[in-house]
Amino acid sequence: MHYIQQPQTIEANSFTIISDIIRETRPDYRFASPLHEAIIKRVIHTTADFDWLDILWFSADALEQLCDALRHPCIIYTDTTMALSGINKRLLATFGGECRCYISDPRVVRAAQTQGITRSMAAVDIAIAEEEKNKLFVFGNAPTALFRLLEHNVTVSGVVGVPVGFVGAAESKEALTHSHFPAVAALGRKGGSNVAAAIVNALLYHLREA
């Protein structure tokens, strides 16, 4: 049985196919910048879903501010271990950054039980309370985490808000688009931890090549 086995070749061929399909099916589509293109194509590569051409929203200064945050030592807080696992932490570390996910932290479990809230909400509360200045929040699964962040009167370096689902997901992301945060958001129900990680990785790869 013959099939491609080299991961670099598989990825390169995938992106070629993605570019060809966009050119054939959306000949008038224009990306706002090379980084905008890289992010959307990486999300499509992750999901095999070309709807992302139209449903990934960026605040006016999101890409500039997210890149500025990532090129300095920062803390990325994720709502799931899946999102944390998908982020290229080795590359992030070259810029002095690290990832944290508190969803299973005993403090989070206790706070969620005591307050009658989701663990995702409690994890955001704990992350907000930490003293680090350069914070990024990356949400791919929990609308309640995104809602909780929006409830806090805080300044953060950026938000990737792409929780997936039918209850609160679209609403939480819509609220993000009206916030003051530098943000990338998925419009509608689609999203996921894999999408969240793909967006962060696209930003990191861009910085590596800059």
Swiss-Prot record:
It is an enzyme of class 5 (isomerase). Substrate binds at residues 14, 42. The active site is at 45 (proton donor/acceptor). Homodimer. It catalyses: Co-precorrin-8X = cob(II)yrinate. Catalyzes the conversion of cobalt-precorrin-8 to cobyrinate. It comes from Salmonella typhimurium (strain LT2 / SGSC1412 / ATCC 700720). Pathway: Cofactor biosynthesis; adenosylcobalamin biosynthesis; cob(II)yrinate a,c-diamide from sirohydrochlorin (anaerobic route): step 9/10. It comes from the Bacteria. This is Cobalt-precorrin-8 methylmutase. Keywords: Cobalamin biosynthesis, Isomerase.
